[in-house]
Swiss-Prot record:
Keywords: DNA damage, DNA repair, DNA replication, Endonuclease, Exonuclease, Hydrolase, Magnesium, Metal-binding, Mitochondrion, Nuclease, Nucleus, Phosphoprotein. Gene3D superfamilies: 5' to 3' exonuclease, C-terminal subdomain, 5'-nuclease. It comes from Penicillium rubens (strain ATCC 28089 / DSM 1075 / NRRL 1951 / Wisconsin 54-1255) (Penicillium chrysogenum). SUPFAM superfamilies: 5' to 3' exonuclease, C-terminal subdomain (SSF47807), PIN domain-like (SSF88723). The gene is fen1. Residues 345-395 are annotated as: Disordered. Residues 353-371, 378-389 have a biased composition (Basic and acidic residues). It is found in: Nucleus, Nucleolus; Nucleus, Nucleoplasm; Mitochondrion. This is Flap endonuclease 1. DNA binds at R47, R70, E158, G231, D233. Belongs to the XPG/RAD2 endonuclease family. FEN1 subfamily.
Length: 395
């Protein structure tokens, strides 16, 4: 799930933190990718007529199809991917995971019912909700990556946290995940949509943590408190606290402790904090996650030549893939992983920091833009209200 509405909060209040561009803009970069999130997206997206792809023996192959071709797309564009797999989830996450299992069980039941009575759209909708990444999916993807010569490592717990460690140490340029909580783990740069298919034509989002903090006028501790208040994987959300409310509460009170004190003493009793709401534990998981240091032997990785015959045996022999396409993919891997050794020009130059005047100018422009948006919103609401108040048939 990640952090609810965090992208919206950053895009509206710190737009300078987000860059969008094409995948080719990341040529020559090493990127640590949240493997479990990627596999989940492959299981949902790589489909035929609403169903996951299957081998002749009835085994799911959507995860392998996605992993093979989306990784090829990255390598074709000069990116050197490193996949990071989740370890055991933190105990605090067990409540959220239990809810997900329950939701999937409900969706499975609804899916079966939709098959009998529903439309094709209903079947597709409930089918996607039943998707779960299993140990077998992970094991098969690891086998595929090994045969492709693409490195992977196993995180002690959360993959995003381990990706962030590697990015902070400079072993990779960025962490790649759809989960916005990667920023809570202090990844300097987060890439989103990197493993999407080319057909979706979604630009790659590049989010810079330092610019987000600057635009929000927060330190990291306040940012983590904001993310917990917005809603994370570790805690139930507080009812009636949306993006705007969460941001204004942290801005005004500066910390979760002060926010909770305000809620408790509020005479209107607008907010009801769940009885068991261990926000301090959630904060600790973001601040000091269970990760390996970047110089740990298990964080060493390198890219190898693909094992072509091994790929043929696994993908073609065992899983029924097309042999010509697999051989073509292996040839592309061999060619482009060598090409990606070229350095990016930016590696030779130190980026110039913005001056205080430039920062002030950017903030002023952003504030003006926000005021214009608010003004337009008010005008639109007023026009809508007036239109409703007009008698029918009035000119």
């Amino acid at each position: 799930m990640g952090i609810k509405h965090l992208y919206q909060v950053i895009s509206e209040n710190a737009p300078d933190a987000i860059k969008t561009g094409e995948i080719k803009n990341h040529f020559g970069r090493k990127v640590a990718i949240d493997a479990s999130m990627s596999i989940y997206s492959f299981l949902i997206a790589v489909r035929s007529e609403g169903q996951q792809l299957m081998s002749e023996s009835g085994e799911t192959t959507s995860h392998l199809m996605g992993m093979f071709y989306r990784t090829l797309r990255m390598v074709d564009n000069g990116i050197k991917p490193l996949y990071v797999f989740d370890g055991a989830p933190p105990k605090l996450k067990s409540g959220e995971l239990a809810k997900r299992v329950a939701r999937k069980a409900e969706a499975t039941e609804a899916h079966e019912e939709a098959k009998e009575t529903g439309t094709a759209e209903d079947i597709e909708k409930f089918s996607r909700r039943t998707v779960r990444v299993t140990r077998e999916h992970n094991a098969e993807c690891k086998k595929l990556l090994e045969l492709m010569g693409i490195p992977f490592i196993n995180a002690p717990t959360e993959a995003e946290a381990q990706c962030a460690v590697l990015a902070r140490a400079g072993k990779v340029y960025a962490a790649a995940s759809e989960d916005m909580d990667t920023l809570c783990f202090e990844s300097p740069i987060l890439l989103r949509h990197l493993t999407f298919s080319e057909q979706r034509k979604e630009p790659i989002q590049e989010i810079h943590l330092d610019r987000a903090l600057e635009g929000l006028d927060m330190d990291r501790a306040q940012f983590i408190d904001l993310c917990i208040l917005l809603g994370c994987d570790y805690l139930e959300p507080i009812p009636k606290v949306g993006a705007t409310t969460a941001l204004s509460l942290i801005k005004e009170h500066k910390s979760l402790e002060k926010v909770l004190e305000f809620m408790k003493n509020d005479p209107k009793k607008k907010f009801v904090v769940p009885e068991d709401w261990p926000y301090e534990d959630a904060r600790e998981l973001f601040t000091n996650p269970d990760v390996r240091p970047a110089d740990h032997p298990e964080c060493d990785f390198k890219w190898e030549a693909p094992n072509v015959e091994g790929l043929i045996e696994f993908l073609v022999g065992d899983k029924g893939f097309n042999e010509d396409r697999v051989r073509n993919g292996a040839a592309r891997l061999s060619k482009h992983l060598k090409t990606a050794q070229q350095s990016r020009l930016e590696g030779f130059f130190k980026p110039v920091a913005r001056t205080e005047d430039e920062k002030a100018s950017l903030k002023r422009k952003h504030d003006e833009k926000l005021q214009q948006q608010k003004k337009k919103k008010k005008e639109d609401a007023k026009a809508k209200k007036e239109a409703k108040a007009k008698p029918r048939g009035a000119a």
